[in-house]
Amino acid sequence: MPRHHAGGEEGGAAGLWVRSGAAAAAGAGGGRPGSGMKDVESGRGRVLLNSAAARGDGLLLLGTRAAALGGGGGGLRESRRGKQGARMSLLGKPLSYTSSQSCRRNVKYRRVQNYLYNVLERPRGWAFVYHAFVFLLVFGCLILSVFSTIPEHTKLASSCLLILEFVMIVVFGLEFIIRIWSAGCCCRYRGWQGRLRFARKPFCVIDTIVLIASIAVVSAKTQGNIFATSALRSLRFLQILRMVRMDRRGGTWKLLGSVVYAHSKELITAWYIGFLVLIFSSFLVYLVEKDANKEFSTYADALWWGTITLTTIGYGDKTPLTWLGRLLSAGFALLGISFFALPAGILGSGFALKVQEQHRQKHFEKRRNPAANLIQCVWRSYAADEKSVSIATWKPHLKALHTCSPTKKEQGEASSSQKLSFKERVRMASPRGQSIKSRQASVGDRRSPSTDITAEGSPTKVQKSWSFNDRTRFRPSLRLKSSQPKPVIDADTALGIDDVYDEKGCQCDVSVEDLTPPLKTVIRAIRIMKFHVAKRKFKETLRPYDVKDVIEQYSAGHLDMLCRIKSLQTRVDQILGKGQMTSDKKSREKITAEHETTDDPSMLARVVKVEKQVQSIESKLDCLLDIYQQVLRKGSASALTLASFQIPPFECEQTSDYQSPVDSKDLSGSAQNSGCLTRSASANISRGLQFILTPNEFSAQTFYALSPTMHSQATQVPMSQNDGSSVVATNNIANQISAAPKPAAPTTLQIPPPLSAIKHLSRPEPLLSNPTGLQESISDVTTCLVASKESVQFAQSNLTKDRSLRKSFDMGGETLLSVRPMVPKDLGKSLSVQNLIRSTEELNLQFSGSESSGSRGSQDFYPKWRESKLFITDEEVGAEETETDTFDGTPPPAGEAAFSSDSLRTGRSRSSQNICKTGDSTDALSLPHVKLN
């Protein structure tokens, strides 16, 4: 449980403290009001004074700083001079040991124990010298035992063997005792139960048997008992077990067992088949040779022959005599020897592989220390960060700031003179040691005078020292600076609380606060450099051991690279799409999903859409540029036609993600017409667009002609010879435009902007119609449109005149062609000019009137035309459009044309046209919507 290091006026919890033995005795005697408390966590001889002296021994108390300061300073001094007391465990229980047990806790004792255990059980370095000496002793005993069996050397070998056996008994006896004792360094072999567990190990059992046999043989020889010597000669065989104990760690047996276990299946298979061959061959040879050859009289003789033959030993004591037996022996020998020889090859290859693996493992074990060092450096660099709150990480660096307390200098010197070793006392007696003492004395002299005065006058208050070294005396060890004010205590009491007994007898205390920020920065930089050095050393140990390691590294790197490439390809597919498809697959998908829009959010789909839109825009811009250039070049002509501009027809192919709902709708006329003739437009006939411009000064008799003929020609019927004409016509490429008189001056394209207030602009115009030339293949009709915003009142005044002229046209018997304005349901977005659509009010222009009114109207509004837009925009045709008059079958002399300002569309038309006329065939003419935007 961590202690609370933040001090305060009320005194924070100081941690878990347990009453020590010496302090308990003092409390029981009643000598001092305070009782000594032991720091459970630190395990050092730190003594606290607690006011609760009546509490029992071994009780866990939650001590406070205020309670610790309640006792007097005399008891503290006596407790320091006395014995420190028993050590406490982490659970607060006192650890009491006897004098012999406390000796075992000595560091030197543990060091020697570990050293001897490593020499005997884990020999390294010069420890092999001792084991080589023991091996020579054992091998010498073996040689002398051999010579003792030879009659010529029996006497000399026996005397030498007796001396050598005495030496062996002494060496083996001492070694066995040391082994049992040094095994206590391992936690599992501590105590008498642990020692018995260690003595039951196989090699310890062998040592015990050899030692007992050697003692028995030597004791029998020294007594001269002949019968005992002859009876104990068999014990000499047990002395051969000394050779077995040479491999104390059993590495050889472990290696053999691992090889056999690794190749157990192969060995069992070879031995099983070899045993079957041995049985069958011996039995068949026995059946053949038992009558003719006395050497094979029994089946046991045949098995002996088979074993010697198949193992390729071949003593030759037994051989088959009959030819049938020899043939069987040869056949089974060829078959059986191959299986009997398999285990040798399997074990040989297994040993080779195992040895190579052990060498590689040793090479890999060399990486442990660099790896551990690297981990340690990484953690220290992390713990030394500016934002780190770690305290223990600065502990190794506090030794540089280690200073001694001046107030206890005499006592410290006295105790250190008793506890210092001879080497250290000699060093302190040297001039260098005297300089150290003088520095310590100067440190004590640099104390502030106010400190001594305050300590004598008020035992409960003391000020901080002036020097840097003495400032650490009154701070708790390894304690962070607290924002709360620290209590001011007596100097001796503070020393009793915060000072730590050093092993050399000097009381010293250094705080983390003494490490200034620049010093911490330097430590941090050093740790970072150590980290980089450790990383470089660790990388050096990662070098491949052999070619197999290189291949493994390359294969692992290749697999990692493939995984990374696959992951990268998956991400690229998610961003850009699935790449290009084959042409067949493209065609199939295009047929099945011709009008379906894909919702693929990939980058590839977006790029394709953008490319299609850019291509559409480029084609439109090219068309507009061609029109503009033609207008500039032919501006002086009397009539400029858009058909002569060679406008490329716009395809209805979907080039973007916009669709027009009109693309598949039929615009038909009213059902109230007397007769309708529906003509579906051909999909492969492209429309041409004719734009006939007139001079600036238009004649009074301006008119428009709508004449659908067999060739869909647009004709012009002038009222007089001075009339100019302005015709907007859409027809096929084969259409022709009637010649118009040359204008007086060049003219520009000026179209008045549409007005929402204009509903009907009508002028009386002679309209010629040729119903006999109407063909099913005709896809367009001529549409003429001229409008001006100044002619609103003029058009309304002529509306009554238009109706009066209709009756005169009926009397003349001329054919009247009535064109009804079409009301599209929902034009949507144009396929050809989708980005240039602007909605305007519907403008229906009806032209009627006499020559004078037309001349007067043209003179009124044409000079006031301002710069107009080049394109006629699309308008929504409302239900409140001007009603179209219907006529009977009597052919009137004149006609009236009502045209809607629907969008001029180019490209293949999928809508039907209905032309309504009177006569034998009653047709309805539906004008196609043409967008020029």
From Swiss-Prot:
Catalytic activity field: K(+)(in) = K(+)(out)
Region annotation Interaction with CALM: where it falls in the sequence: 371-379, 522-529
Modified residues (Phosphoserine): 89, 448, 832
Biophysicochemical property: pH dependence: Optimum pH is 8.2. Channel activity is inhibited by acidification.
Residues noted as binding a 1,2-diacyl-sn-glycero-3-phospho-(1D-myo-inositol-4,5-bisphosphate) in the record, renumbered to the chain: 249, 265, 362
Keywords: Cell membrane, Ion channel, Ion transport, Membrane, Phosphoprotein, Potassium, Potassium channel, Potassium transport, Transmembrane, Transmembrane helix, Transport, Voltage-gated channel
Annotated control of activity: Phosphatidylinositol-4,5-bisphosphate (PIP2) is essential to activate KCNQ5 channel by inducing the coupling of the voltage-sensing domain (VSD) and the pore-forming domain (PD). Calcium suppresses KCNQ5 channel current through calcium-bound CALM C-terminus. Therefore CALM acts as calcium sensor that controls channel activity. Zinc potentiates channel activity in a pH-dependent manner. The activity is modulated by small changes in cell volume. Activated by the anticonvulsant retigabine. Inhibited by linopirdine and XE991.
Compartments where found: Cell membrane
Membrane-spanning intervals of the chain: 127-147, 158-178, 202-222, 231-253, 268-288, 327-347
GO molecular function, one term: voltage-gated potassium channel activity
Entry-linked Gene3D superfamilies: 1.10.287.70, 6.10.140.1910
Cytoplasmic face of the membrane: 1-126, 179-201, 254-267, 348-933
Start-end of Basic and acidic residues biased regions: 583-598
Biased composition (Polar residues): 432-441, 900-924
Subunit details: Homotetramer; forms a functional homotetrameric channel resulting in the expression of a small M-current. Heterotetramer with KCNQ3; forms heterotetrameric M-channel responsible for the native M-current. Heterotetramer with KCNQ1; forms a functional voltage-gated potassium channel. Interacts (via C-terminus) with calmodulin/CALM; forms a heterooctameric structure (with 4:4 KCNQ1:CALM stoichiometry); the interaction is calcium-independent, constitutive and participates in the channel function.
PANTHER family: POTASSIUM VOLTAGE-GATED CHANNEL SUBFAMILY KQT MEMBER 4, POTASSIUM VOLTAGE-GATED CHANNEL SUBFAMILY KQT MEMBER 5
Entry comment, domain topic: Each channel subunit contains six transmembrane segments (S1-S6) with S1-S4 forming one voltage sensing domain (VSD) and S5-S6 contributing to form one quarter of an interlocking pore-forming domain (PD).
Identification of the protein by name: Potassium voltage-gated channel subfamily KQT member 5
Organism: Mus musculus (Mouse)
